[in-house]
């Protein structure tokens, strides 16, 4: 029984030695490149796609289109400026909002009927 305890004790040697070998800088560099690639494909690339879609949506917006803001306000576009859009809500209130505050652009119905 004492042999079992001795063999299980830390630092006990049975005549063979093992050395831990590290991966060195190569494996560290590989892991770093791997995580940067994952970060790029999971975060940066989709964000660029969303930004491109948003810019396209805003550039195609015109007077008469209905927009929904990020706050949930729905209105009809009555004027478009460089950075802002003036909309008219259901109770005839005119609001000037930034283009960044627009969540969705709903095309004018008469134009959709002519196209489709």
Curated annotation (Swiss-Prot):
<keyword id="KW-1133">Transmembrane helix</keyword>
<dbReference type="GO" id="GO:0015031">
    <property type="term" value="P:protein transport"/>
</dbReference>
<keyword id="KW-0811">Translocation</keyword>
<dbReference type="Pfam" id="PF02699">
    <property type="entry name" value="YajC"/>
</dbReference>
<keyword id="KW-0813">Transport</keyword>
<protein>
    <recommendedName>
        <fullName>Sec translocon accessory complex subunit YajC</fullName>
    </recommendedName>
</protein>
<comment type="function">
    <text>The SecYEG-SecDF-YajC-YidC holo-translocon (HTL) protein secretase/insertase is a supercomplex required for protein secretion, insertion of proteins into membranes, and assembly of membrane protein complexes. While the SecYEG complex is essential for assembly of a number of proteins and complexes, the SecDF-YajC-YidC subcomplex facilitates these functions.</text>
</comment>
<keyword id="KW-0812">Transmembrane</keyword>
<keyword id="KW-1003">Cell membrane</keyword>
<keyword id="KW-0997">Cell inner membrane</keyword>
<dbReference type="InterPro" id="IPR003849">
    <property type="entry name" value="Preprotein_translocase_YajC"/>
</dbReference>
<dbReference type="GO" id="GO:0005886">
    <property type="term" value="C:plasma membrane"/>
</dbReference>
<keyword id="KW-0653">Protein transport</keyword>
<comment type="similarity">
    <text>Belongs to the YajC family.</text>
</comment>
<feature type="transmembrane region" description="Helical">
    <location>
        <begin position="25"/>
        <end position="45"/>
    </location>
</feature>
<comment type="subunit">
    <text>Part of the SecDF-YidC-YajC translocase complex. The SecDF-YidC-YajC translocase forms a supercomplex with SecYEG, called the holo-translocon (HTL).</text>
</comment>
<keyword id="KW-0472">Membrane</keyword>
């Amino acid at each position: 029984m004492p042999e079992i305890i001795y063999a299980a004790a830390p630092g006990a040697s049975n005549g063979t030695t093992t050395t831990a070998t590290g991966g060195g800088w190569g494996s560290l560099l590989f892991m770093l490149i791997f995580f940067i690639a994952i970060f790029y494909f999971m975060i940066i690339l989709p964000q660029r796609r969303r930004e491109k879609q948003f810019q396209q949506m805003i550039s195609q917006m015109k007077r008469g289109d209905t927009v929904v803001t990020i706050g949930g306000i729905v209105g009809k576009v009555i004027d478009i400026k460089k950075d802002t859009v003036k909309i008219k809500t259901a109770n005839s209130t005119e609001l000037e909002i930034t283009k960044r505050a627009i969540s969705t652009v709903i095309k004018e119905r008469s134009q959709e009927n002519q196209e489709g």
